[in-house]
């Protein structure tokens, strides 16, 4: 879509429509939607970088999301410092696993979708509404998912109705599922969830929740080669997002580094991590 000969916006921009940016693209530029692009045949999953492990956990007053920094392409480390946790809007965040390029593009479209709705309606979507919009985006990528290019995000945010955090997971068909307390997606998710089962407490503070998610990513990296643990030589640490009633905040690198140093120092004494009490 370009300006016409007189320098005016095309008619598409001047025609009244709904509050969905995705519907606008579908009607006027469907080729810009990821799911509308045609691909060849065959499994392409080993030919593109993949993001790996994302974890999220709620605490009293909000939710924490953490993502490792490794992207893999088959048995190759494609990138050591990729970022996989992003703000969706002021009160929510999204973490990506699966085909990295498609996932990042989907996150950008999701961010625009939420901003577009807010500008037209003068209010934000409810957290359930945001989760449903992301579900529709994932469903639109089903054709690519069938060829190995799946995008499986994790969505979390602060819900003002309950004054607390909520977590939503998805399957490649766009199915949406609300998770309780904590969840993880990606290749190391089984190990991360197992770790959080032992470490999670409903009474945890935000700082304790951050430490638990870093411990979970460490455990995932310990058993899953596609998940990157803290890179102490390069000082590359997980991306941590915290969402509370004050909005989304990315934890500063220096603060994450201090927690990582503490976790790694303790692992030198106990490599398998902290022991959970038996009662």
From Swiss-Prot:
It is found in: Cytoplasm. The active site is at residue 52. Pathway: Protein degradation; proteasomal Pup-dependent pathway. Its main location: cytoplasm. SUPFAM superfamilies: N-terminal nucleophile aminohydrolases (Ntn hydrolases). Residues 1-51 form a propeptide. InterPro entries: Ntn_hydrolases_N, Pept_T1A_subB, Proteasome_sua/b, Proteasome_suB-type, PSB_actinobac. GO terms for cellular component: cytoplasm; proteasome core complex, beta-subunit complex. Coiled coil: none annotated. Its EC number is 3.4.25.1. The 20S proteasome core is composed of 14 alpha and 14 beta subunits that assemble into four stacked heptameric rings, resulting in a barrel-shaped structure. The two inner rings, each composed of seven catalytic beta subunits, are sandwiched by two outer rings, each composed of seven alpha subunits. The catalytic chamber with the active sites is on the inside of the barrel. Has a gated structure, the ends of the cylinder being occluded by the N-termini of the alpha-subunits. Is capped by the proteasome-associated ATPase, ARC. This is Proteasome subunit beta.
């Amino acid at each position: 879509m370009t300006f016409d000969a007189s320098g005016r916006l095309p008619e598409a921009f001047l025609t009244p429509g709904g509050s969905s940016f995705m519907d606008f693209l579908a009607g006027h530029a469907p080729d810009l939607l990821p799911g509308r692009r045609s691909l060849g045949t065959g499994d392409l999953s080993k030919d593109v970088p993949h993001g790996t492990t994302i974890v999220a956990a709620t605490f009293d007053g909000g939710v924490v999301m953490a993502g490792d920094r490794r992207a893999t392409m088959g048995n190759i480390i494609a990138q050591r410092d990729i970022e996989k946790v992003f703000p969706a809007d002021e009160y929510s965040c999204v973490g990506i696993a699966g085909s990295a390029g498609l996932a990042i593009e989907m996150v950008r479209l999701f961010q625009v979708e939420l901003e577009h709705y807010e500008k037209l309606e003068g209010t934000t979507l409810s957290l359930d509404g945001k989760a449903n919009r992301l579900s529709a985006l994932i469903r639109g990528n089903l054709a690519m998912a069938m060829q190995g290019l799946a995008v499986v995000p994790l969505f979390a945010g602060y819900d003002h109705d309950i004054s607390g955090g909520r977590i939503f997971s998805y399957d490649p068909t766009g199915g949406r599922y609300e998770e309780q307390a904590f969840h993880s997606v990606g290749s190391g998710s089984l190990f991360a969830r197992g770790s959080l089962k032992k470490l999670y407490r409903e009474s945890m503070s935000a700082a304790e929740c951050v430490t638990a998610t870093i411990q979970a990513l460490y455990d995932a990296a310990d058993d899953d080669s596609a998940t990157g643990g803290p890179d102490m030589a390069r000082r590359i640490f997980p991306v941590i997002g915290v969402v509370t009633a004050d909005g989304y905040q990315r934890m500063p690198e220096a603060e994450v580094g201090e927690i990582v140093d503490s976790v790694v120092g303790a692992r030198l004494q106990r490599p398998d991590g902290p022991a959970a009490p038996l009662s």
